[in-house]
């Protein structure tokens, strides 16, 4: 690990604390701005099982205020931070005037990382963008009531409380989805992706437009840098998304 990354590296426990703080603040804001009006509640919980993932749970009765919960895995937070470190390390290690370096001429700029952030902020911003997007993805499932949609096309369940688990490509029995069930699974995942991206962009603009966050003359550069790092965060999530299980209970 190079010196720049080593200086901003966190211990696992500190990564967990940071993730809890970031998503806890978002949960608080959403409860005040959205759920309070409905008389409902959004809660955040963490799972210690060593798995890349997150899932959304809805445990409310018909006609009652929404009771939503998003569960995040600590391992997801840990690996995203480590991936962000490795990404920054890799980009700094590209030899000047090498073939890879020359590819950046296509964009008119060989700068690999935004210059408006220091080493610690680079990793931190990639991390925050990635876990925030995953959190918003799960909230997208809840807001669009994908549990109802998937349950309609999935296995039948009795009672007023839904207990089914629905995965990206598998039913709760770990049987591969096919046909209409697979179609509904794909569509709801894409819908949650859209919701997550929309919520994240709105949150990003809210922060950048805050005079206390960044001064006016620096706003464009900072916004551009944050968008760049958000895309990098999405790349850190690629493997997670391919292996992640989304439950809707």
Regions found by a protein language model. Name each.
Residues 86, 154, 206-210:
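Short amphipathic alpha-helical leader/targeting segments
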Residues 9-20, 174-197:
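Active-site metal-coordination segments of metallo-dependent hydrolases
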Residues 1-133, 139, 143-152:
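Peri-catalytic and regulatory segments of divalent metal-dependent proteins
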Residues 185-186, 194-249:
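Long, well-structured alpha-helical subdomains associated
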Residues 145-185:
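Post-HEXXH active-site segment of zinc metalloproteases
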Residues 107-129, 174-186, 217-226:
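Intrinsically disordered, low-complexity acidic Ser/Thr-rich regulatory segments
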Residues 59-76, 143, 171-174, 233-249:
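Short, Lys/Arg-enriched charge-dense amphipathic segments
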């Amino acid at each position: 690990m190079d010196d720049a990354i080593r200086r901003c590296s966190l211990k696992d426990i500190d990564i967990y604390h940071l993730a809890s703080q970031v998503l806890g603040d978002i949960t608080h804001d959403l409860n005040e701005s959205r759920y309070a009006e409905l008389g409902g509640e959004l809660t955040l919980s963490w799972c210690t099982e060593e798995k890349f993932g997150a899932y959304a749970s809805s445990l409310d009765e018909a006609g009652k205020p929404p009771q939503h919960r998003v569960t995040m895995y600590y391992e997801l937070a840990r690996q995203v931070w480590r991936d962000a470190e490795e990404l920054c390390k890799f980009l700094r290690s590209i030899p000047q005037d090498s073939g890879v370096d020359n590819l950046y001429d296509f964009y008119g700029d060989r700068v690999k990382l935004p210059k408006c952030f220091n080493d610690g902020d680079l990793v931190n911003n990639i991390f925050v963008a990635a876990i925030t997007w995953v959190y918003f993805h799960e909230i997208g499932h809840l807001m669009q009531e994908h549990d109802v949609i998937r349950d309609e096309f999935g296995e039948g369940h009795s009672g007023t409380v839904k207990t089914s688990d629905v995965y990206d490509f598998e039913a709760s029995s770990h049987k591969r989805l096919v046909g209409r069930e697979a179609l509904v699974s794909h569509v709801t995942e894409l819908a949650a992706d859209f919701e997550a991206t929309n919520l994240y962009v709105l949150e990003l603009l809210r922060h950048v437009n805050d005079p206390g966050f960044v001064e006016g003359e620096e706003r464009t550069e900072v916004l551009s840098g944050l968008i760049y790092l958000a895309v990098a965060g999405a790349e850190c999530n690629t493997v997670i998304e391919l292996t992640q299980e989304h439950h809707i209970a």
